């Protein structure tokens, strides 16, 4: 495994900025509002593409043991306990605080190798930087400015000196065989509860407060000899409901996760049915063209009549994505999880399937003969040939003439025909239509000089007669 380095400290000392600087990403949310980071957030520090160590960002510790603050502190303690080296991050501009003293006392009891990282040194004199925290007695002190990437090389060098020798781990590797799954949905439908159930630990903070998860958290899982990468995302609300700037950033990162995943699991609250917020999330998945599994959570809490109502509402509101499998489950009690993974696998296989040009042309020929395109204002579209253009989602390019008048109903017919013929489940199917180009369009027949002379001779001969 890759060795693990944990970033701990009080709120707003720059831990997430340092995380982004070390991992060369923007995976952790950064904002001047304290308390933005709540869960553990993992990344990898690399040099020239080679992974050196894993980094875990934690929420700011405020000394409270109740509510979300307490849950955030527990996540930070778990991260520090599993780390090989702890980076205790402080803010030189604000100086020493009582909260820093409390965190240091806890770290000394933990007995983990710890480096003091003095952040935000830009514009501060060297004398102030070295004297402000001198009484802490650290032998290893690294001044940095995470925002300006100042001092990072020294920090990485000191971290490597403390780390044990290990190989590349699978917790945060770039294994291409892993199925990347994004759990998405509106706030408080049970995404974090479901991921915790799958992992068998309290990896995500779970609360009845909507919007508890603000960042997208990535963890790896092995189940039934298969590898997965799970991403728990912040709940997407309608834009009019997204008020805090931080929540807007979270929503944006959720959209990024949808773009990067292979299979999106849309989690619905079975007791509340399909809401406008659910439709917003679904629209983002469809726009990205991702494989889709619909999961009805909290199914065990419904009676027979309520289940019938939920099924009816689902078929009416989500009938246009009837190609997506629907799984009924309970994240809290763990029922339906095997069916969920089976649906994910079927969607993943369908989304990444490769097609030959001959088989898709045969399918187009049968579809065309079974139901030719209708005549639109006296014009009939002609479909000449098709070829595959990509996967995830399966994409096909159809060439022909008068394709601009091809109605949307016929395009949907082709999608459904291909989906049924090739047994594609859980994935959208895209068709692109290209008009056949006339190779002589815009070209003028220009005679050569020899042809012009010959034409003149012929014309003179005709005139004599």
Swiss-Prot record:
Keywords: GTP-binding, Nucleotide-binding, Repeat, Ribosome biogenesis. It comes from the Bacteria. PROSITE patterns: G_ENGA. SUPFAM superfamilies: P-loop containing nucleoside triphosphate hydrolases. GTPase that plays an essential role in the late steps of ribosome biogenesis. Belongs to the TRAFAC class TrmE-Era-EngA-EngB-Septin-like GTPase superfamily. EngA (Der) GTPase family. This is GTPase Der. It comes from Xylella fastidiosa (strain 9a5c).
């Amino acid at each position: 495994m890759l060795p693990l380095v944990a970033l701990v400290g009080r709120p707003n000392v720059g831990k997430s900025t340092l995380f982004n600087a070390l991992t060369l990403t923007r995976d952790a949310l950064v904002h001047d509002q304290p308390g933005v980071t709540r869960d553990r957030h993992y990344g990898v520090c690399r040099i020239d593409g080679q992974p050196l160590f894993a980094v875990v960002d934690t929420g700011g510790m405020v000394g409270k043991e109740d509510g979300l603050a307490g849950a955030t502190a527990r996540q930070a303690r778990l991260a520090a306990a599993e780390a090989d080296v702890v980076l205790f991050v402080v803010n030189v501009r604000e100086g020493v605080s009582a909260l820093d003293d409390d965190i240091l006392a806890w770290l000394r009891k933990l007995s983990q190798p710890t480096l003091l990282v003095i952040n935000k040194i830009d514009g501060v004199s060297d004398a102030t930087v070295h004297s402000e925290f001198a009484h802490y007695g650290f032998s290893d002190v690294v001044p940095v400015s995470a925002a300006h990437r100042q001092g990072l090389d020294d920090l990485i060098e000191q971290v490597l000196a403390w780390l044990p020798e290990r190989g590349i781990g699978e917790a945060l590797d770039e294994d291409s065989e892993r199925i990347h799954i994004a759990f998405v949905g509106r706030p408080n439908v049970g995404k974090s509860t479901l991921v915790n159930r799958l992992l068998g630990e309290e990896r995500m903070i779970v609360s009845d407060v909507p919007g508890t998860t603000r960042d997208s958290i990535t963890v790896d899982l092995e189940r039934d000899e298969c590898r997965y990468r799970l991403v728990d995302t912040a709940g997407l609300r309608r834009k009019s409901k997204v008020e805090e700037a931080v929540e807007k950033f979270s929503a944006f990162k959720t959209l990024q996760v949808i773009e990067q995943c292979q299979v999106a699991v849309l989690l619905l609250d079975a007791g509340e049915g399909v809401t406008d917020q659910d439709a917003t999330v679904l629209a983002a998945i469809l726009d990205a063209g991702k494989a889709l599994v619909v999961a009805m959570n909290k199914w065990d809490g419904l009676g027979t009549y309520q289940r019938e109502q939920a099924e009816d509402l689902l078929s009416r509101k989500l009938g246009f994505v009837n190609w997506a499998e629907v799984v009924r489950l309970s994240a809290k009690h763990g029922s339906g999880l095997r069916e969920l993974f089976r649906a994910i696998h079927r969607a993943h296989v369908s989304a990444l399937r490769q097609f030959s040009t001959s088989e898709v042309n045969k399918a187009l020929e049968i579809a065309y003969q079974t139901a030719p395109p209708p005549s639109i204002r006296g014009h009939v579209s002609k479909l000449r040939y098709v070829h595959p253009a990509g996967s995830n989602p399966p994409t096909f390019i159809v060439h022909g003439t008068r394709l601009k008048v091809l109605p949307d109903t016929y395009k949907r017919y082709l999608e459904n025909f291909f989906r049924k013929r090739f047994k594609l489940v859980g994935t959208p199917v895209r068709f692109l239509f290209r008009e056949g180009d006339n190779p002589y369009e815009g070209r003028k027949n220009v005679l050569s000089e020899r042809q012009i002379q010959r034409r003149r001779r012929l014309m003179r001969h005709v005139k004599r007669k």
